[in-house]
Design a protein with these regions (language model features):
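Conserved structural position within tetratricopeptide repeats
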Residues: 32-35, 71-74, 107-108
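Bacterial Sec signal peptide processing site at the extreme N-terminus
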Residues: 3-22, 37
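Short, conserved micro-motifs composed of acidic
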Residues: 20, 58, 82-85, 92-226
Length: 226
């Protein structure tokens, strides 16, 4: 009885967080409910796994979303739309053979579904494209990247030697973690290129622009003055 009450409490909290769009906190509550649900309650475990999967998908936690979708499928609680989401997660994660297998099942069940048909083509062609390589040379810029989210870069300056971007790295203002993403709120950072072409370590913009709340993608006027 106590275990059942604990499960219900986590589920109610999870649903509340979910209604607020706080997917990270919702996933955490659903995970605790899933862990406490006995293995013999297959239907309940499958339903909770599905809730977890959808939350993880929202916050771009692809490997966790895949694992949760697999459990939902294993417990026969995933609809065709859920299996489509699972197949697309596999494709996104580079698991092309497994994605192709899932998309084939979906095309057989939903022959008119454009997403399923396009997904199957993508899963078949992606390994070929990957093997052929790209005309572009891409390399990781360690000076810009952190272990958190770094996004929305904007170049500024006559020589485009100033790079502004948003980051949720540890140096961002505030101490609280977002219930949506599980990371700190985003701040705007700046890196500058010197005369030797070397970029500086990014630093948070001063002057009171950054706060403990989210400072999203920045933008500039065409003349770069504002």
């Amino acid at each position: 009885l106590l275990i059942s009450c604990g499960i219900d409490r986590h589920l109610k909290k999870g649903e509340k967080f979910l209604s607020l769009g706080e997917y990270y906190d919702a996933a955490d509550q659903f995970k605790q409910a899933y862990t406490k649900t006995p293995a013999k309650e297959r239907d309940n475990r499958g339903k909770i796994a599905l809730k977890m999967a959808r939350c993880y998908e929202k916050i771009n936690s692809t490997p966790k979303a895949i694992a949760a979708y697999r459990n939902a499928i294993r417990y026969n609680q995933a609809s065709l739309d859920d299996r489509l989401a699972y197949a697309r997660m596999l494709l996104k994660n580079g698991e092309y053979k497994q994605a192709e297998k899932e998309f084939r099942i979906l095309v057989d069940s939903m022959p008119d579904n454009v997403l399923a048909k396009n997904g199957l083509k993508s899963a078949q062609k992606a390994p070929i494209w990957k093997k052929e390589g790209s005309r572009y040379k891409i390399k990781k810029m360690d000076v810009f990247n952190s272990r958190r989210d770094d996004y929305s870069p904007m170049l500024l300056g006559d020589e485009y030697d100033q790079l502004y971007f948003t980051s949720t790295r540890n140096e961002a203002e505030g101490d609280e973690l977002s219930g949506i993403t599980g990371t700190k709120a985003g701040d705007i950072f700046l890196s500058e290129k010197d005369d030797r072409g070397k970029w500086s370590k990014p630093e948070a913009i001063g002057g009171g622009l950054n706060t403990a709340y989210d400072e999203g993608a920045c933008c500039f006027t065409p003349d770069g003055k504002e």
